[in-house]
Design a protein with these regions (language model features):
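Short secondary-structure junction/hinge motifs that connect adjacent elements
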Residues: 42-64
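Flexible, small-/acidic-enriched active-site or ligand-binding loops
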Residues: 151, 199-228
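Intrinsic disorder at enzyme termini
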Residues: 1-24, 156
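Internal helix-loop-helix
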Residues: 62-133, 173-180
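Hydrophobic, small-residue-rich alpha-helical packing segments that form membrane-like cores
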Residues: 146-148, 163, 172
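A short, Trp-centered hydrophobic/proline-enriched beta-strand micro-motif
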Residues: 132-140
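Mature N-terminal segment immediately following signal peptide/propeptide cleavage
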Residues: 19-39, 43
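A short core secondary-structure module
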Residues: 153, 166-206
């Protein structure tokens, strides 16, 4: 009697989901896996001990086309959500801090600009963020409110052609190294987001030190003290 043998079990894919992936998705997964093996794993121990992540890694990740890879236009790769998830899974296997840099950059900072930003803001920031030339962060979580917008204490008020921003955010990935922050604040018209470039008067992003986890990730406070934000 003829018998057939089952395909070998892969510990990382025991549900055999690989069969449902496209060739492009497999290629992206395998390319990111190789990147992690050569550019992350040999160094992540030192990054953990030093509690740092080299700035030039963002440029390498940009060359890998994983920054904002699920977005279309403005230099973004425009891949499927599945491909993006596979890339993040491979990055996470190397280190959570590296994956955090990528997912905060793409899913939070870049997506917010891509979805709600003006055309000028998109053209200014997204191409540079896709290459890793510019880094973004996402300021929602607060010391007393957590990530609940309904309890948000950060406020912004109109001042001529711009806004004045006051309040503090906490546990913000990429904050200290960010070239632009997407900061959410309560206004008289409701909660809205603001793009706050590095060097904005009254705005600072001190790093949080002595973490027990996610050490190879820059985690920061965001502090607005009458920060002058353009409209």
């Amino acid at each position: 009697m003829a018998t057939t043998s089952a395909p070998p079990i892969r510990p990382s894919d025991f549900l055999d989901l690989d069969a449902f992936l496209s060739d492009e998705e497999r290629l992206i997964r395998d390319t990111v896996r190789q990147f992690v093996a050569t550019e992350v794993v040999p160094h992540v121990g030192d990054w953990f001990e030093q509690a740092t992540l080299p700035r030039e890694l963002a440029t390498k990740l940009g060359a890998l086309n994983v920054l904002g890879m699920h977005l279309t236009g403005y230099g973004c790769a425009g891949t499927s959500a599945t491909a993006y998830g596979l890339a993040c899974m491979e990055l996470e296997a190397g280190d959570s801090g590296v994956r955090s840099l990528v997912s905060v950059q793409g899913s939070l900072a870049m997506f917010a600009i891509w979805k709600w930003g003006s055309e000028e803001q998109k053209a200014t920031w997204l191409p540079r963020m896709a290459t890793g030339e510019a880094i973004g962060c996402f300021g929602l979580t607060e010391p007393d409110a957590g990530s609940d917008p309904g309890s948000m204490r950060t406020r912004a008020r109109r001042d001529g052609d711009g806004w004045v921003l006051n309040g503090q955010k906490m546990w913000i990935t990429n904050g200290t190294i960010a070239d632009v922050a997407v900061v959410w604040a309560r206004t008289d018209e409701g909660v809205r987001g603001f793009l706050v470039p590095r060097g904005t008067p009254g705005f600072s992003a001190p790093e949080i030190h002595k973490k027990l986890s996610l050490r190879a990730s820059v985690t920061s406070l965001l502090d607005g003290d009458d920060a002058q934000v353009p409209a």
